[in-house]
Amino acid sequence: MKITKDEINHVAALSRLEFGEDEIDKFTEQMGDIINMAHQLAEVDTEGVPETVQVVDRETDFREDKPEHWESRAELMKNVPEKADGFIKVPVIIDKDDNE
């Protein structure tokens, strides 16, 4: 399967990323190489090889999920990069008029 520049540009637009023409050329070639490698892996004979779900024999230890009350709002807010009227200000990621 051949990856085209148009496909790379489409994915970049969906991701809201901007690249120069030289970067698009580079990514097109790299993605083509990745797809070709995946096709090669699909051809490997794995008959009789047991499935491997996780290569590390270890379980994840989760902490207890319990709410904690913050005594000091000021302590929390001192680590916030942008604030507005006592709230945490975050960047806009979805435009209201975006139809894509």
UniProtKB/Swiss-Prot annotation:
- Molecular-function annotations in GO: asparaginyl-tRNA synthase (glutamine-hydrolyzing) activity; ATP binding; glutaminyl-tRNA synthase (glutamine-hydrolyzing) activity
Q: Which UniProt keywords apply?
A: ATP-binding, Ligase, Nucleotide-binding, Protein biosynthesis
SUPFAM superfamilies of this UniProt entry?
Answer: Glu-tRNAGln amidotransferase C subunit
Q: Answer whether the UniProt record assigns the keyword ATP-binding to this protein.
A: yes
Q: What is its EC number?
A: 6.3.5.-
Give the superkingdom in one word. Bacteria
Biological process GO terms, please? glutaminyl-tRNAGln biosynthesis via transamidation; regulation of translational fidelity; translation
Q: Top enzyme class of this protein?
A: ligase
- Chemical reaction(s) catalysed: L-glutamyl-tRNA(Gln) + L-glutamine + ATP + H2O = L-glutaminyl-tRNA(Gln) + L-glutamate + ADP + phosphate + H(+); L-aspartyl-tRNA(Asn) + L-glutamine + ATP + H2O = L-asparaginyl-tRNA(Asn) + L-glutamate + ADP + phosphate + 2 H(+)
Q: What family is reported?
A: Belongs to the GatC family.
What is the annotated quaternary arrangement, including any partners?
Answer: Heterotrimer of A, B and C subunits.
Q: What does this protein do?
A: Allows the formation of correctly charged Asn-tRNA(Asn) or Gln-tRNA(Gln) through the transamidation of misacylated Asp-tRNA(Asn) or Glu-tRNA(Gln) in organisms which lack either or both of asparaginyl-tRNA or glutaminyl-tRNA synthetases. The reaction takes place in the presence of glutamine and ATP through an activated phospho-Asp-tRNA(Asn) or phospho-Glu-tRNA(Gln).
Q: What is this protein called?
A: Aspartyl/glutamyl-tRNA(Asn/Gln) amidotransferase subunit C
Organism equals: Lactobacillus johnsonii (strain CNCM I-12250 / La1 / NCC 533)
